[in-house]
């Protein structure tokens, strides 16, 4: 083997990268993109090879193969070049001989984890016994001598690994209960949040989440195209807004969706993040499934009484697929409140996976007491040009799990823009330098005065010879008016156009300011003591004072400017358009343009969606209303699960239905969401507003909402996200 190599302190990297290149330093900060992150892990692995006395530059190693796997779908030029470079190296370079590869946090392929041969458990059990005896003796010596034990952390972790591997068939998992179980009990139940302070004000937040998921067999083993056409509602004149007409493809699969803040963080975590940090971004996501349990249900008639018998089924299987290439329709479950539950100690369920299918919809626009009948209230038939029927079985690699098996997705790296956790108060009227005072007040109750408007210096865009605060030019437009209560029509039917959420400036104007109305059930924050079919509802008002729209007091004036204006020279909120009552300029007026600045929609804890998939169109929207983070490349692959068909001996391939054994399953889902935040600098003299619990039982922040009752009832309403103000100019 060639002599050990030495890592250079400085190397060469192409523009736009920090680690993608030979011989560079390992402390260049955050990688610029997923390919650069893969290069960083590759460099770290090379560093471990070099420290162990090996030369990875002349040999093809496991680190090289990992880099190839991580960059196989790279869209950037550097990732593509690096990918093919190491593929070429693999073809010509000899393989690096090593007993153990250095571990990194690289992306691993999604798949089932295979179990070692049985003889390994025997050998490791012997090693465990020997290690335990040695550790006990060492512990006794250390405690009696009063000396510290070097590398105690590594020793503990090594012992834990041996113990987990030694459990084997019939053993407990990770130090659990005694033997008697089936398969290997794996994994750990962890819902902690860790904060690692990196320096320069940056914080790495690692949110761990675990849920017990219950899974029934699907209602049908078939894919079904189902039509919904609520003609009872839409046949009534003026009921266009109640239209539900659509077609959907119902699949026999279920979606395991963790894309909601309440899955990952507890309320006090959100309070801490929003009170102390100024911005937040996503880094990576890992998911796994373990401790799969599959059972069958049979009924027996004992003395005229039906009794259900539950048995473990060691041959039944659960099917798992991850749409890592985003082939299937993207259906985030937070929008319908069907993500995994928010309470780690309560079992939860997966959401049935279904997606829209193209069908035309023709619905007439009508109004109350209109004469005649509703002429158009029809749905079309599938069109060959637009029909897209996707099946999981034909688009995904499916892993089969049986009792005791486990599955891991590997690591996904986000490419998103950070979101601010502070709000802005500066409107256009508060940008720049205030007018010059001509006199100062002589008492605390007095007001200052300004130079006469006709004598002031300044700029306006009006053809008048005076300057006021109302007509001064400002550098940009903060926030913007936009049409609200605007229903557009597509070939699929009418829909309400989305609005950028803004702070409420008038209490009765929630719809005009884009407030979001959440309706949710007990798994996602509803009071568990509630009864009846109606869900709990909460209207989320954005905290962004600078972009609030006060539609009641806006107006438009004709040119040239005349003060005071005549009736025919001004359009106010009180003036109807045409001869209509209560339809005004704010319903059609839009001031969005190249001069417009506005805040990003804030995260909404706990019910809000976290990330979203970018629309596959040439021109992208600047933001999404449904989630604060939009993935610039593929979004994390949707995880889909279902129970494999468990048939009886009466199977008829020509029958309309399948004769199935009643089967259900449970499994533990575990995820790790890594985020990066920036600590908020303290800049003001005055104390700032903070998210804080109160003891007032009727207040919004009453602590009793997040405390259990005597019977365990819980509630979790949305928490404020941006409590602290910031300067924007």
UniProtKB/Swiss-Prot annotation:
Annotated organism of origin: Murine minute virus (strain MVM prototype) (MVM)
UniProt name for this protein: Capsid protein VP1
Biased composition (Gly residues): 168-184
GO molecular function, one term: metal ion binding
Transcription keyword on record: no
Domains (record comment): The N-terminus of VP1 is sequestered within the mature capsid. It contains a phospholipase A2-like region and putative nuclear localization signals.
Physiological role: Capsid protein self-assembles to form an icosahedral capsid with a T=1 symmetry, about 22 nm in diameter, and consisting of 60 copies of two size variants of the capsid proteins, VP1 and VP2, which differ by the presence of an N-terminal extension in the minor protein VP1. The capsid encapsulates the genomic ssDNA. Capsid proteins are responsible for the attachment to host cell receptors. This attachment induces virion internalization predominantly through clathrin-dependent endocytosis.
Binding, Mg(2+): 325
GO cellular component terms listed in the entry, alphabetical order: host cell; host cell nucleus; T=1 icosahedral viral capsid
């Amino acid at each position: 083997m060639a002599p050990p190599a030495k890592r250079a302190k400085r190397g060469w990297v192409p523009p736009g990268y920090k680690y993608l290149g030979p011989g560079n330093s390992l402390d260049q900060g955050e990688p610029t993109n997923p390919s650069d992150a893969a290069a960083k892990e590759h460099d770290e692995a090379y560093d471990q090879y070099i420290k162990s006395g090996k030369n990875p530059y002349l040999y093809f190693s496991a680190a090289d193969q990992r880099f190839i796997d991580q960059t196989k779908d790279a869209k950037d030029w550097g990732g593509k070049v690096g990918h093919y470079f190491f593929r070429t190296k693999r073809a010509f370079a000899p393989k690096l001989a090593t007993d153990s590869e250095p571990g990194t946090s690289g992306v691993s392929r999604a798949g089932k984890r295979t179990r070692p041969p049985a003889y390994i458990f025997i050998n490791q059990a012997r090693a465990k016994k020997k290690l335990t005896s040695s550790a006990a003796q060492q512990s006794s010596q250390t405690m009696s001598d009063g000396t510290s034990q070097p590398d105690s952390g590594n020793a503990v972790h090594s012992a834990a690994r041996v113990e987990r591997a030694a459990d084997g068939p019939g053993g407990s998992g990770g130090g659990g209960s005694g033997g008697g179980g089936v398969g290997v009990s794996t994994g750990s139940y962890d819902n902690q949040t860790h904060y690692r302070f990196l320096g320069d004000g940056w914080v790495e937040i690692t949110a761990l989440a675990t849920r017990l998921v219950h899974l029934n067999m699907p209602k049908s083993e078939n894919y079904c195209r189902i039509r919904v056409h609520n003609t009872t509602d839409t046949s009534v004149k003026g009921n266009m807004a109640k239209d539900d007409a659509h077609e959907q493809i119902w699949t026999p699969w279920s979606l395991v969706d963790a894309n909601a803040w309440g899955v990952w963080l507890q309320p006090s975590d959100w309070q801490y993040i929003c009170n102390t940090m100024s911005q937040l971004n996503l880094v990576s996501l890992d998911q796994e499934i373990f401790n799969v349990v599959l059972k069958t249900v049979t009924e027996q008639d004992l003395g005229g009484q039906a009794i259900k018998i539950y048995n473990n089924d060691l041959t039944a299987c659960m099917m798992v697929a991850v749409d890592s290439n985003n082939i299937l329709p993207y259906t985030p479950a937070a929008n319908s409140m069907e993500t995994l539950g928010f309470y780690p100690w309560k079992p939860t369920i997966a959401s049935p996976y279904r997606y829209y299918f193209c069908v035309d919809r023709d619905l007439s626009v009508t109004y109350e007491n209109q004469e005649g009948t509703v002429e158009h209230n029809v749905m079309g038939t599938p069109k060959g040009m637009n029909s897209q029927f996707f099946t999981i079985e034909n688009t995904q690699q499916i892993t089969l799990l049986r009792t005791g098996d486990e599955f891991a997705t590997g690591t996904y790296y986000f490419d998103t823009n950070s979101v601010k956790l502070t709000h802005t108060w500066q409107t256009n009227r508060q940008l720049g330098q205030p007018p010059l005072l001509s006199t100062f007040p002589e008492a605390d109750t007095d007001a200052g005065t300004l130079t006469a408007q006709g004598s002031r210096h300044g700029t306006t865009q009006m053809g008048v010879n005076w300057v006021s605060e109302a007509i001064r030019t400002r550098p940009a437009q903060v926030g913007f008016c936009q049409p609200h209560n605007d229903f557009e029509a597509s070939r699929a039917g009418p829909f309400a156009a989305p609005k950028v959420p803004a702070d409420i400036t008038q209490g009765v104007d929630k719809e005009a300011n884009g407030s979001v109305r959440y309706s949710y059930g007990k798994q996602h924050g509803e009071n568990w003591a509630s009864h009846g079919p109606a869900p709990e509802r909460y209207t989320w008002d954005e905290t962004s004072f600078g972009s609030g729209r006060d539609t009641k007091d806006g107006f438009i004036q004709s040119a040239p400017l005349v003060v005071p204006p005549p009736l025919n020279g001004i359009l106010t909120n009180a003036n109807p358009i045409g001869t209509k009552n209560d339809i005004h300029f704010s319903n059609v007026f839009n001031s969005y343009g190249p001069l417009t600045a506005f805040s990003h929609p804030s995260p909404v804890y706990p019910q809000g969606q976290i990330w979203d998939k970018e629309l596959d169109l040439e021109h992208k929207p600047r933001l999404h209303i449904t989630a604060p983070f939009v993935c610039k490349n593929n979004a994390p692959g949707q995880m889909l699960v279902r129970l494999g068909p468990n048939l009886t001996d009466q199977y008829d391939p020509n029958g309309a239905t399948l004769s199935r054994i009643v089967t259900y399953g449970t499994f533990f889902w575990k995820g790790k969401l890594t985020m990066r935040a920036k600590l908020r600098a303290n800049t003001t003299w005055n104390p700032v507003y903070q998210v804080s619990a109160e003891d007032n039982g009727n207040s919004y922040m009453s602590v009793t909402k997040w405390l259990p009752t005597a019977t365990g009832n819980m509630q979790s309403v949305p928490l404020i996200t941006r409590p602290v103000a910031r300067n924007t100019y």
